[in-house]
């Protein structure tokens, strides 16, 4: 399993890349492996306010649909349209081309609740 050291993680298998007051969000390599072949993605609307630990997106496989939870509270700044057109990119490149959305977070203290790579590795 690929678990990049420079990212933060959630217990629900989302990854977060912090950049100033913005955070890029996707699902982990472990999550995409468990979900198997991603066939459809529903992303939040740009400008939508999201709350930490609340559903923000949906990833569907041939087996089932999985809620993707926002790791931080804030406003959706950008969504990755390429995963809407080609959802399989989430399986192929979960940490790069397969990211889901970028959020402008509103509570920096919530970052402390995210897991470091080693803690996430122990979780899975």
UniProtKB/Swiss-Prot annotation:
Highest taxon above the source species: Bacteria
Domain Lipoyl-binding: 22-104
Stored PROSITE patterns: BIOTINYL_LIPOYL, LIPOYL
Residue numbers bearing the N6-lipoyllysine modification: 63
Cofactor: (R)-lipoate
Gene Ontology CC terms: cytosol; glycine cleavage complex
Subunit structure: The glycine cleavage system is composed of four proteins: P, T, L and H.
Keywords: Lipoyl
Similarity comment: family membership: Belongs to the GcvH family.
Purpose of the protein: The glycine cleavage system catalyzes the degradation of glycine. The H protein shuttles the methylamine group of glycine from the P protein to the T protein.
Stated name of the protein: Glycine cleavage system H protein
Free-text comment on the cofactor: Binds 1 lipoyl cofactor covalently.
GO BP annotations listed: glycine decarboxylation via glycine cleavage system
InterPro entries: 2-oxoA_DH_lipoyl-BS, Biotin_lipoyl, GCV_H, GCV_H/Fam206, GCV_H_sub, Single_hybrid_motif
Pfam families registered for this protein in UniProt: GCV_H
